[in-house]
Amino acid sequence: RGLGDVYKRQVSLFSEMENKIPAWDANAPLHIGSSITLGTCLLPSLVKVYQEQHPEIKIYVTVKNTGTIEQAVVDNQLDFALVEGTVTHPEIISEVFSADTLCMVAAPGHPLAANRTVTLADAASCPLLLREPGSAGREIVESLFLSGGIQIAPAWESVSTLALIRAAQNGLGIAILPELLVRDALKSGDLVSLPLPPDILTRSLYLIRHRNKYLSSSAEEFQNLCRMWKF
């Protein structure tokens, strides 16, 4: 009879766990990673909308450069992440959810601002204000110039996009940054966009997660919000 009682207790515990799993799944906390660009101009709005709909769900956010976020996904520290730039790690599943455009910007009085077209060679002849090595933005810019056979040596390297914007506004060189981050400065006239060929700096934005990561229903819903977001 003792073994029978133990068996019944185990069955009861498993049944209780099965009943609780849906409630846990629906209210599971979210651990979301983001690149610096998307953590600056996109993720805050997404989190605000999601938390207005689901105030009971706790959200923990990590914002670092794409390389660091990619490693955090591999190490299973995050449920998923939003990044720009291609991720090739075999343990990561990536999905394009949107796209954005990088802009080459400078102060209105910059010598290239009056040109009808600007070549990569023109840009490389000026001081370049770029993101730090390891960031997706830096990798894209380096690949772009290398495709034209041009090696670059940035005058400024910074993890802070605001520092690069301020440097460009003060006439210290050319910055190459996401349009989302420089939109206000362009509207105010503090910066001007240099006329590169159309679509030369268009890039994809990705949702990434570990291939073995189970996504709760709350995580799935947040990802759906990302897919539907217009910006």
Q: Residue ranges of each PLM-predicted region?
A:
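Flexible hinge/capping segments at coil-to-helix
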Residues: 89-102, 106-128, 133, 217
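Alpha-helical linker/hinge and terminal dimerization helices associated
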Residues: 8-24
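Hydrophobic hinge/microswitch elements
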Residues: 65-70, 74-78, 83-84, 139-193
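Short, small-residue-biased leader/transition segments that mark boundaries at the very start
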Residues: 2-7
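A late-sequence structural motif
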Residues: 42, 192-231
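Central regulatory/effector-binding core of bacterial HTH transcription factors
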Residues: 27-90, 158
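Secondary-structure junction motif
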Residues: 112, 127-148, 215-219, 223
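Beta-alpha-beta core module
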Residues: 89-96, 100, 115, 162-211
